Amino acid sequence: MDRIKELALIVAGIDEEYQNGIIDGVIACAKDNAANISCFSAFGGVISGKGYDIGEYNIFNLANFERFDGVLLMINTISDPDQKNKIVAKVRKSGLPCVVFDCEDYPDFYNITIDNTSAMEELVRHIIRDHGAKRIEYLSGPASNPEAADRFEATKRVCAEFGIEIPPECIHYGEFRSNDGRRTAQKMLASGRELPDALICANDAMALTAISEFTEHGIRVPEDMIITGFDNTYNARHHFPSLTTVGRPLSQAGYNACDLVIRLIDGEECERVQRLDAVPVFAESCGCKSALSEDLAAYKKSTYHVIDSCREDINLLNRMNSELAEAESEAESMSVISGFLGDMDCECCCICMCDGWDSAWEDNGMISDGYSPKMHAPLIWDKGTVRYFGSFDTTQMNPVIHETGGNISYFLPLHFRERCLGYFVAINGDFPTKSMLCHSVLMNISNSLENIRKLISLNSAIRELDRLYVIDPLCNIYNRNGFIRAADAKFRECRRKNEKILISFIDMDGLKHVNDDFGHNEGDFALQRLSSTIVDCCREGWICARFGGDEFILLGTNVDDEDETILGETFRTRLAQINKLMNKPYLIEASIGTVVTRIKDEDTLFGLITLADEMMYQQKKKKPSRYIRR
């Protein structure tokens, strides 16, 4: 039996109809040949934020070409030039057979191309010759996109045939996204220029939103202005007015590309370029009659299905948002998400998280370029069964290993702005390409995980602030605040149980002399050694603190009267041992006053502390005034 072929598909914007059509053909061919497809897809260019695009395009860094036999590269769907160059360089370095679509910029790759120019020229010629358009504006895709450039050049050539020039202010650029059409229409309306006879758009998505914007302002299409598109999408065919556009055999292009790369893997000699023909579709937006003769009942049924699906999608998003808002940990979030994966029509879904994605501190462990060396999959939903997959090498990419061919796995990024959190894997289902919900679900999951990360950071910061509030930074024991908080509970417990309590007040002797004669670093060192001696004197359940300056305090429970003497002797013995070990030119000495008593009704914690302080002072008065060793 032949080894199963593994193919990588690199693409952006799989929710768009162009990408959909090609991917459908790729999948059909892969199934016919029992090959597996791993599709790495980003939704780049959706918003203007640079950080968001960095997070999206990072998914391409996941592709480990050492595990693939061939590459299908839809480089024409990626608008960022730096990302294009980076991906192309990696594919070239891999040495794998690679097929691109509609792109002649990389002659070392094989190319499945649909003739963008002939049909576009015929469409523009029709607008000028048959409908009398003289003033034309053009809405292009990205200037760096070869398809966009081909369509624009075709438009200019035909305009030149008729002596028509498109001035620079009448040339607009977008990202092939629907919002570009609306923004361009708004820009044209705000310019104060006379509207053109025709607005020619480089794709249907931009053309349709331009029509909507102009219609809202009382401008009729085609009566006041002709608008055309390119792609002959479902929405273009069923819009009113139906869109004059260019139809392309997208599914056939995808099938041919997959078939080509499989034959290349098998060692066949193949032509570098395969060309498919596109055809102009003249419809109502230019003033022609639509050629569409679809059964009205079927169209109504299809439209109802779209509306009903949209309603269900909104309901699902609302429920998911509400439930994810309650999640406060990775486990809780995965539990919520697992309850919705059954609605996504995939055989299997995986959530793979970077090690340290929930790092508490903003600058610690943040990944924006690539992934952590190890990943873990806190959620694998497999035909209704939920399981956890532990740590695995990121080079493996997919925690689910396919033992058969004909599988399609979509790898989609999980991130917050440029911060990489992990990725989502959807296996054998149409959800990533056919559902309007996919991108929103991924953003919901990402935002929920980021909220959890921030909650972890906030709780960590609160704990650190609390520690700083109650811990003395020099001696690393309680400060006055920490002691009062801890001692108050022990004091009340002793009173309730009618048990004796021990309170010792300790004051270092001669700290000023150490600071003055040997420097403050030595003074700090002496305080730390005294602190460690006091800690060593504490039994289990006792607490101690630096009460301020050179003053320390110790509180003990479960004590007897003789513990006052035992504590004093232990303290002096250990202090002597410290001095002997240090062999410093000064002695660390301290005065101690201790109270052991059963708490009476009128006693207070501060009252007993004051009593211990007075006893300490009486001991200090008996000592000489010189503490420096000569």
Give the role of each language-model region.
Residues 1-319, 323:
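Bacterial carbohydrate/catabolite-sensing allosteric modules
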Residues 296, 520, 565-572, 576, ...:
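Catalytic-core segments of nucleotide cyclases and related cyclic-nucleotide turnover enzymes
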Residues 319-323, 459-480:
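Amphipathic HAMP/coiled-coil signal-transducing linker helices
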Residues 323-365:
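Helix-loop-beta substructure at the N-terminus of cytosolic sensory domains
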Residues 398-402, 406-415:
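A short, aliphatic-rich beta-strand micro-motif
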Residues 430-450, 459-463:
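Amphipathic alpha-helical "output/dimerization" segments
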Residues 466, 479-502, 512-536, 545-549, ...:
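Conserved long alpha-helical elements within nucleotide-processing catalytic cores of c-di-GMP signaling
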Residues 543-546, 586:
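A short pre-motif secondary-structure segment
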